[in-house]
From Swiss-Prot:
One of its GO terms (biological process) is response to redox state. Signal peptide: none annotated. It comes from the Bacteria. Keywords: Cytoplasm, DNA-binding, NAD, Repressor, Transcription, Transcription regulation. Homodimer. It comes from Thermoanaerobacter pseudethanolicus (strain ATCC 33223 / 39E) (Clostridium thermohydrosulfuricum). GO terms for molecular function: DNA binding; DNA-binding transcription factor activity. HAMAP family: Rex (MF_01131). The lineage of its organism: Bacteria, Bacillati, Bacillota, Clostridia, Thermoanaerobacterales. InterPro entries: CoA-bd (IPR003781), NAD(P)-bd_dom_sf (IPR036291), Rex_DNA-bd_C_dom (IPR009718), Tscrpt_rep_Rex (IPR022876), WH-like_DNA-bd_sf (IPR036388), WH_DNA-bd_sf (IPR036390). Belongs to the transcriptional regulatory Rex family. NAD(+) binds at residues 91-96. Modulates transcription in response to changes in cellular NADH/NAD(+) redox state. One of its GO terms (cellular component) is cytoplasm. This is Redox-sensing transcriptional repressor Rex.
Amino acid sequence: MSKKTKVSMAVIRRLPRYHRYLEELLKNDVKRISSRELSEKMGVTASQIRQDLNNFGGFGQQGYGYNVEELYNNLTKILGLDKTYNTIIIGAGNLGQAIANYTSFEKSGFNLKGIFDINPRLFGLKIRDVEVMDIETVEDFIARNKIDIGILCIPKDNAQYTADRLVRAGIKAIWNFSPIDLKVPDDVILENVHLSDSLFTVSYRLNEEELFKKLKGETAKIDG
C-alpha cells in the first residue's frame, strides 16, 4: 500500500505536464491561453483541463481563459514546488549516477544530500560534489540530515529490504526505479517507476496497425 490521495492519480499525473508547458509559455512571454489552446498542446479535452483544475478551485475566467503566470504559480504551489526537499539516492550505478547528474531536480527544489551503495570501491566517489557512502550508514544519515525522499536505483533482489530500512529510519516518500513494485506502510508515499513501461508503449504503437490488421483478418475468417 501507499499513502492515498484526495485527487485521482490520473489528474495528478497530468499536473506536471501542464506545469511544464506553462513554463515554456512564460519563457516565450505568453500572457494568457484558452482551455482549447491548452488542450490542443496537452492532448486532452478542454473540459478535462477544466475538471482537473477545478479540483483545486479553478483558475480560469469566462471569455478570457487562463492567466499563464498566475496558473503556473498556482500549479507550482499545488505540486509543492515552492518548497525544498532533501533526497538521497540508493545505488551509485549508471542509473543512480544519471539521476544524480540531472541538475533540473535541484532547480526544482530537490536537494541531493547523499548517495549510498554496497560496493566499497565506490565509497568516496563524488558526483556533483555529493559523496558516495556505505549503505550501512544510511539510517544515521537520514536522521541527521532530515531526509524527505529516498530514490531507489538498485536491483530488485535488495529493493524491498532497503525500502523497509528507509521507512524504519523515517523516510516518508520513496521514488523507486528498481524493477519491482514495493510495498510500504499506508503513511509512506511510493512512486514505482518502471522505465520499460514507457518503452513497451512505444513498441506497441509501432506494431498497432499490424496487430489490428491481423485481428481483423482473424475475425473475418471466423465470420466466414
